[in-house]
Amino acid sequence: QSRKNKILTYLCLPISILSQMILGSSTATIATIIGAAGVLSVVLFKKWNKEINAYFILCANFVFNALLIFGMTGFLGGIVHALFNKDLTFSNRTIAWGKAVTNILQRPITGTGILTSDEMKSVLGSLSFNQAHNEWLQCLWQGGIILFVILVLLLITIAGKINRIQHRKLRFMCCMFFISVFIEMAFEVWLGLV
């Protein structure tokens, strides 16, 4: 059974990564690679002493998003260009981010509520954008600080549950998936339109 699971893992992981590469999504490719690294760590290593605190991952995610959204382009520019051969507009996502922030400031406590795809495109000023392309901005935009706090509390609860996992390899794998989700959330609306 264990050997069969390993073989299945070795077959599925490259297919998962290659499928994201074929689709051309840099964000999904990186997130999938990180998730795959978590799975491989469980499969390959018999002894595992690595510890990652899920609360640290959550805090690092907030810092990363703040730097990303509020313009640390000088710091991130070289890294993004070297890794993904993309400019720092992240396929023009920074335009959507700026317009989302403007809309958040209009109704910061309760947000605007759910907008239709056409309304989103109109507000964001592009036919190709029907969301803010950042989960945190989308959450603040549609549900305001109230929904943002609810989402943060949910993620704190998840981080606590991950940290309480006794099996170290499983805890590490869950942390890697937590990171994968946050990478997706930085550039897409991963949880869907709230």
Predicted regions: what is each one?
Residues Q1, M21-T29, T89, E135-C139:
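Membrane-interface segments at transmembrane-helix junctions in multi-pass inner-membrane proteins
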Residues R3-N5, G143-F182:
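Hydrophobic transmembrane alpha-helices and their immediate junctions
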Residues K4-C12, T27-A31, N53-A60, F172-M176:
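Alpha-helical transmembrane segments of integral membrane proteins
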Residues Q20-L23, L40-N85, V101-Q106:
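A membrane-periplasm/extracellular boundary helix in multi-pass inner-membrane enzymes
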